[in-house]
Amino acid sequence: MHYVDPNQSGSKIHFKDQYENFIGGQWVAPVKGVYFDNISPVDGKSFTRIPRSSAEDIELALDAAHKAKKEWNKSSPTTRSNLLLKIADRMEANLEMLAVAETWDNGKPVRETLAADIPLAIDHFRYFAGCIRAQEGGISEIDEDTIAYHFHEPLGVVGQIIPWNFPILMAAWKLAPALAAGNCVVIKPAEQTPVGILLVAELIQDLLPAGVLNIVNGYGAEVGRPLATSPRIAKIAFTGSTQVGQLIMQYATENIIPVTLELGGKSPNVFFADVMDHDDDFLDKTLEGFAMFALNQGEVCTCPSRALIQESIADQFMEKAIERVKRIKLGHPLDTDTMVGAQASLEQQEKILRCIDTGRQEGAEVLLGGHGRQEVGNGYYIEPTIFKGHNNMQVFQEEIFGPVLSVTTFKDFDEAIQIANDTMYGLGAGVWSRSTHTAYRAGRAIEAGRVWTNCYHIYPAHAAFGGYKKSGVGRENHKMMLDHYQQTKNLLVSYSTKAMGFF
């Protein structure tokens, strides 16, 4: 099936010529009246205009959020839970529209937005609707007359900066627990992909009290920095590059506020020899796991961009693996048969191609791909690319954020772990083995926040996600996220009528 391009007869989505910021429950033009063109990576053409906001717009959003927090912070868990469920229902009723819009804004295949991005976003709202209803405080008996009560209280107003690789889903990852915990939110979407969360806001604006959700568009230095440095937020959450994450952490220290950072990765995908013991469903699954570097055009922080293959099976495994990758269909993102779509921006496409050139220059062998492709108009397409080399090469160490895989080999278990951990990152990893003993040992030994074992790229709402080393601080998903958006109030009460006897 091929979905009709936006703004055409029969299309699932008709974009407005221009969008505004969402502040205090209203659609508000930027203070300075400046806009920028939003380019679709599918064809390289502008399809709408987005506010190029400034610090003044951030202040307006913070005004609205602080006004709303007086009531929202005190709202009952039931109220918040029911609202999150309504948000999920509204999104589900418009799933196809959101999926097509997200594809046009980001370039990813519609098969992914239909089956993963939007359904997962919906599920996150439902999951945290359940979590907040189930959350309990605590009581500690100090002695027979003294009790310590522990209450969960919202932080107040929080800032969130959303990346461009999963715009709606990453917004849901942050927004759902923040709202469930009773906070008001100011979101800054990525300037490359701002439309998706604006469409969600249009769908749910009648559900939310004014000021609980505020969205301010613009560039990082002009909007993101004023938000992250504001003394009026009680927390900042950011997903993006490690370099920008370091700045966000510095900003947070100035105001002594908590920070959640989900940053870069160079994830190892480790294939032990026993995966080739039989030509069966498990081997087929393993080969799919190898090809997962191309999911979302490789624009995933946990992209399995390093494949480590045991020497004894390297030749025969790679023969099958390359054939599997050759079957990946690159094409128009609105075609449901397309498996790899467009890179999210011209800037990103050019960066990936430079990294591919660097790989060639440093002696890495190109086993497959290695070139840009013209698919739709002037869209930003790159062939899935496989390099063969060693772990000291730049293509093994630097995050490329594209459909580029670097392959090397290892002799034994210890060398596999040594190579896997030889990186400054620690966000994700994959382990493939028929031996549960080997898989478990490897999973525990690899320094990463999530280790997929005989699977990859599964992102359930109730599994904690986050990085080791320079891949970030804190976690996302799982019920523990409520704690990340709350603070604990201890009420220590004496029920005794007698003095303590000190004075």
From Swiss-Prot:
PROSITE patterns found in the cross-reference section: ALDEHYDE_DEHYDR_CYS, ALDEHYDE_DEHYDR_GLU
Effect of pH on activity: Optimum pH is 9.5.
Entry-linked Pfam families: Aldedh (PF00171)
Reaction(s) catalysed by this chain's protein: a long-chain fatty aldehyde + NAD(+) + H2O = a long-chain fatty acid + NADH + 2 H(+)
Keyword set includes Transcription: no
Enzyme Commission code(s) on record: 1.2.1.48
One Gene Ontology MF term: long-chain fatty aldehyde dehydrogenase (NAD+) activity
A single GO BP: protein homotetramerization
Active-site residue list: E262, C301
Residues that coordinate or bind NAD(+): G218, Y219, G220, A221, E222, V223, G224
Keyword Transport: no
Alphabetical keyword list: NAD, Oxidoreductase
Coiled coil: none
CDD domains assigned to the protein according to its UniProt record, in alphabetical order: ALDH_ACDHII-AcoD (cd07116)
Activity regulation, free text: Completely inhibited by p-chloromercuribenzoate and N-ethylmaleimide. Strongly inhibited by iodoacetate. Inhibited by Pb(2+), Fe(3+), Ag(+) and Hg(2+) and partially inhibited by several other metal ions Mn(2+), Zn(2+) and Cu(2+).
Temperature dependence: Optimum temperature is 43 degrees Celsius.
Knocked-out gene: effects: Reduced aldehyde dehydrogenase activity toward n-tetradecanal, although cells are still able to grow on n-hexadecane to some extent.
PANTHER family for the chain: ALDEHYDE DEHYDROGENASE B-RELATED
Described function: Aldehyde dehydrogenase that shows activity toward n-alkanals (C(4) to C(14)), with a preference for longer carbon chains. The best substrate is tetradecanal.
Oligomeric form and interacting partners: Homotetramer.
Name used for this protein in its record: Long-chain-aldehyde dehydrogenase
Organism: Acinetobacter sp
Record lineage: Bacteria, Pseudomonadati, Pseudomonadota, Gammaproteobacteria, Moraxellales
Encoding gene per record: ald1
